[in-house]
Amino acid sequence: MWPHVSRPEDGQVTEIVAGLYMSPLELLALLCAVALVVARWLPAAARPRVTIAAGTVLLLSAIVLFVVGIRWQMLPVLAGAALALPFALAPLLRHRTGRPAWRARWWLALPGSVACVGLIATAPVTAWAFPVPVFPEPSGRFAVGTRVVQWTDQRRPESFTTDPHDRRTVVVQLWYPAQKSPQGAQRAQYLGRTEPEARTVSAALARQVGLPGFLVGGVTRAHSRSVFNAPVAGGGGRFPVVLFSPGSGGVRTQNTAWAEELASHGYVVAALDHPYDSAAVVLANGRTIHSQIASTGHRDKDEELAVGWTAVRAADLGFVLTQLDRMDRGEITGPLTGRLDTGRVAVTGHSIGGAAALQAARQDRRFDAVIDLDGYPHGPTSPSLHQPTLALTQAITPSTDPRYLPRLSKALKLSTATGYRLTIPGAAHLTFMDGPLYLPPVPSIVGSLGRTESPHVVAATTLAFLDTTLRHEPGDMADILSAYGDLSVYHPDNSR
């Protein structure tokens, strides 16, 4: 469904080549560094030409890389080249001065050459492990636009602060069907409206999981497939709406690949930042709000805290739907006025965001469908869900919380509408967001589906569910979903 191809603006020497995880300029520098190491082993007649050419090109490449911003993965390449350079240049310099050429004996040179090549080889390995994410090309007929809005709920005090005048503010990113942009149009920055915002968010996410920020620095260089503030697609049609709440500490952009795929198929996706919960939320005035939530390690206490956080998120989702309805009616100005079908709305979320989606649906009948992406249901199971629900779960292992599936199944069994629980083999908790695109492909972290298949499976299953529930397209939902894993279907009158 999604070929893993390069971005439309690729072709520049600093853009990442999909599948190679390095830019043409980085690849050139790497090859030149290897050439400097190998030069010592070439026939005497070839050594000067190879050394001079490789050294010159490497120097120019390094200068450009430092100017545009060098990635940490390239530092071992330069270090390996720097170690090899004196041994490559020494014979040339001695020859120019008329002195006999000097070369290290082979039994001394061989270990040094191997060490230099090993140092240089760490670049492609680490670039593969911590790449600049290359987002899949959306498969739908629409181009994708995106914009960011900020809304304040004047009726709701901010529960995370003690200021009695503080009101709850949320930042929302919209992805929507758009007109095709001109060739070479600048794609949207990932993780933020600007690169500084992306760096702020990336650093906060890294701190949250205990990683040095530089390891995942590639995400701040990434651009997605959408275009900021692109004109809305023509035709005058109204688009179903999908609201999304990210995982604990997660940010509005964490499911960008999924949001862009849905938008390309004619949905408007509204993803939320939850201030004081999301790792970092940059407001329109430049103020940054960092996460204040933290688990205690005590199961009952953490469950109590999670119930409270889930309730705040559920209220955020209901408020955003109200604002989108006002936008559609023209009470809030914007290009999507008259184009949002707020009579066909799904509420979705990942992890605790999935729990918030379930809770929001219980409280608000304006939501017509629910998608829970591997979210443990926190909070009360009443009132019962009345919307069709799709719950995608990771592969169940001995480390899985034994309460998870029974609690999720209970919520689906109590529903007055059909529910689906699909366990996807090879999936991990982070499979259901953009993580597989930029984190090391370690099964315990991002699953074993791979960087191409992970976003494909999540998008294919959720898109099929949305098309059936919101657009009433024909098809056997159970038959479609069962192709992707172990499916359980829960009917209002019985379960199986």
Question: Model segments located where?
Answer:
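Short substrate-entry loop that stabilizes the transition state in hydrolases
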Residues: 222-239, 244-282, 398-401
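Alpha/beta-hydrolase-fold serine-hydrolase catalytic core, especially in secreted/extracellular enzymes
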Residues: 14-117, 128-138, 145-146, 154, ...
